[in-house]
């Protein structure tokens, strides 16, 4: 149905439930994608989330602070947190059993790893790659699959849905791969 004009929707659409599911849908997919790319995993098995409006009093329908933890079948947790009330920047690290990978500094260090197989500290470089948009447009022309195809998008969506539902209901949610469903539990 129709609704009355609201000028706030022109620039602040992301604050409303009928447009998005908040931080889980706007920011989490980028990091869930990185987790899949770097570890080779596909879908989280279950997750929890919480958050709330602790900073902004502007009529938003979504939390300004969000935290989710998801478990993956390979035996690790993905912990994502974001606060829109702090400009401290992003921090993305992977804490493995032999090393810590700091994606902000592009370094690998033995910090936090085991003593019997410590990683050699080193700086890593990113490989130059085309942007997602350039890759997508090239694939439209060539009829090839893009780097992030629909299957990868679906993997990210499962992480988003688990987290958003867990946040909204206060219940842990899990992914049933056989039926491709996210359910409480």
Predicted regions and their residues:
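Non-transmembrane alpha-helical segments in soluble domains
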Residues: 32-36, 69, 133-141, 154-157, ...
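Tryptophan-centric aromatic hotspots in well-structured domains and transmembrane helices
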Residues: 13, 27, 31, 35-37, ...
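NAD(P)-dinucleotide binding in Rossmann-like oxidoreductases
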Residues: 58-60, 64-66, 71-131
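Active-site-proximal structural scaffolding
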Residues: 27-28, 40, 61-63, 87, ...
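C-terminal helix-rich "cap/oligomerization" subdomain common to oxidoreductases
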Residues: 58-61, 139-185
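Acidic/polar loop patches that form or flank catalytic/metal-binding clefts of enzymes
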Residues: 41-49, 77-80, 101-104, 145-149, ...
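Predominantly a Rossmann-like dinucleotide-binding segment in NAD(P)-dependent oxidoreductases
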Residues: 1-48, 53-59, 90-92, 123, ...
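Generic alpha-helical secondary structure signal
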Residues: 8, 128-135
